[in-house]
Amino acid sequence: MAVLIPAALVTFFIGIAGIIFMPDEIKNKPLDFDRGTIKIDHSVIDVEIAESDAERQRWLMFRNEEFSLNSAMILVYPKSDLYALWLLNIQYNLDIMWFNEEGKLVYYIKDAKPCENPLDPHNCTYKTTVPAKYIVVSTEGFLKGNNITNSSILTPISI
C-alpha cells in the first residue's frame, strides 16, 4: 500500500503536466462535434453534441471562442448519474445545467469559474447533487439570457 500512494501521485502529476504542456498543434486541433438543436422552455438552442467518451473528455478544452446566448454544448451520457465537470484548460466562465432523462432541470451553476491552479481541482470541479443524463454548457449569461429557472425543461429536437 505504501508503494501505491507515491506511484499514484506521480502518475497524477505526470498526467497534469501532460495536459498543461500539451503541444499547440494538439491543443488547437478543432474537434468536429455533431450539431443539433434543443429547446429549453421556449428558447431554441443550437448545440454542439459531445456524445462519445473522447468528445466528453475534450469538450471545451483549449477553446477560445465563446458561445452566443442561443448556442451551447450538450454532453449526452448513456445513463443518468452524478456527473462532474472539471474546468481544466477552459478559457472563460460558463453557465452549467444538468437535466435528467425526462428533461427536467435538476441542478445548475451560474458563472462557473475555470481552473486557476490545475493542481487544485476542488475549486474548479462542478458536480450535480441529483442524477442527470444531459449537461448543457454555455457562456456565462446563458441562464439569464434564456430565462432558465428551476422548473425549466429540455426538449431534444435533433441530437
Residue locations for each model-derived region?
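N-terminal Sec-pathway targeting helices
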Residues: 1-10
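Compact, glycine-rich, soluble single-domain proteins
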Residues: 15-159
